[in-house]
Amino acid sequence: MPHRSFTSDFMQNYRAPWWLPGGNLQTIWPALFARRTRGPVPEYRRERWTTPDGDFVDLDFLANDVSRRRPLLVLFHGLEGSSRSHYSEAFADVAWRGKLTYVVPHFRGCSGEMNLAPRAYHSGDHEEIGFILARLREMHQGPIIAVGVSLGGNALLRWAGECGESASRLASAVAAVCSPLDLAAGGHAIGRGFNRVVYTTMFLRTMKPKALRKWAQHPGLFDREALLQARDLYDFDNIFTAPVHGFTNTEDYWRRASAKPHLHRIRIPALALNSTNDPFIPADSLPRPEEVGDWVTLWQPGNGGHVGFPAGAFPGQVMAMPEAVTAWLLKASGITPRVPAEWPRAPMTVPAAL
């Protein structure tokens, strides 16, 4: 397992800037206003792959000319995310500066075009993770490292737990950032108070229209009238996500899709980063060291919000977390990045010769 370093110590002891107190501000401000990249906005080239069920997934590859022997960083996005989410662009910047290959596979329906099959995506979709990583492994000669953000991280660790030792055939190391590894705890938290008013409303604003478009593709797939009345993610999952993807109801979906009960089965280096002030994830639901086994490293700083982790002077930047997580993944794969003494003000880099 990778040992402690400057970057890991920084993240484990992370403190938000004084001008961004509290988990909600540390979540909302970075997503909307903080600087995402040290360089230009990343450019992508898109590939469309046919899936085993006759559908398609769209993958956005960073448009940099890099040898296939360099490490490949794969990012699985969060709920309603994409390659243009703030964290996706921040990780793309890390890859661009480190001359890494980088790709964001979009979950079904998240690339800007509705998928065709009578399904969407969900938090426990480890089969989709496995299909994508296996295809990338066929294409790429160098090591593959993968990070999942929020929903994508739960699915990624769920895949790693499901595969056990065989996961190492496809990936050298994996990481989950602010992932609701106990879906029931996270689902109930986001359905209460401020979270319900702000975050639930934001998610349903795009999720309900997409579900209705899916119903138009496949009439009768779910109870359309009930979906129109859904007021929170519990209802949405009960009416759409669970039955469409083979679960009995919301409770069954949350229980079977959660990665937390499977963390002890992971047999490749894995990192789970969660702030204890994440508005979406109760701190008392986070995994404890005795629950995860020797292959899983836990970073649980007191600050950071949900996929925030802002740093620096106003208006702040969000590159420190992606650089620290990428550094951990590289070290777990036997590659030592270069971290200057001025980091995170100055960027982490990756040696040209590997």
Residue ranges with predicted function:
Residues 2-9, 140-245:
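Alpha/beta-hydrolase-fold enzymes
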Residues 23-66, 310-312, 316:
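N-terminal cap/lid segment of alpha/beta-hydrolase-fold proteins
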Residues 51, 62-116, 131-135:
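Short, surface-exposed "cap/lid" segments of acyl-processing enzymes
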Residues 119-139, 158:
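Alpha/beta-hydrolase active-site loop
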Residues 239-262:
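Active-site nucleophile elbow and catalytic-triad environment of alpha/beta-hydrolase enzymes
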Residues 266, 272-274, 278:
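Short beta-strand/loop motif that positions the catalytic acidic residue
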Residues 276-297, 301:
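Conserved loop-alpha-helix segment in the C-terminal half of the alpha/beta-hydrolase fold
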Residues 302-354:
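Catalytic active-site module of serine/aspartate enzymes centered on a nucleophile-bearing elbow/loop
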